[in-house]
Amino acid sequence: MSAPETQLAGFIARFTPDIAACGTEVLARLAARIPEAERLVYDNYNALAVGFGPDERASTVILSVAFYPRWVSLFFMQGAGLDDPHGILKGQGSTVRHVVLTQAGDLDRPEISTMIDQALVKAKKPLPVDGQGRLLIKSVSARQRPRRPGPDIG
């Protein structure tokens, strides 16, 4: 394992086994689907997020997987501009939308898979045609919310 992979595994290990397993499988499936994408890791205050984009800049991220204490979400960074005939995308902001994943297999649901394809096609900056993306640890917040649910998290 490379140093960034070891560091990411440590971040993920702080979540419950169910969340860690789901999120890890989602990351693996997306990395296999778009191997040319750079994977940018942000271990932030509210969540652990891994963005998939064409380069090392956060502003060009197309998709992002976020680990929360009780769920894993797939974010579409330009989701407001996507066609959503099934109404699966959540969010009301001017740009970003997301879908909560209950299991990694949700990526295979036609409505989610189609949304991923659409996001990749409509990306402001497309992914490289070939190559192998890197895993980059971009930010680790000193202060973080608990990564496992507790009685005070509702």
What are these regions (language model features)?
Residues 1-154:
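Charge-dense, helix-prone N-terminal extensions
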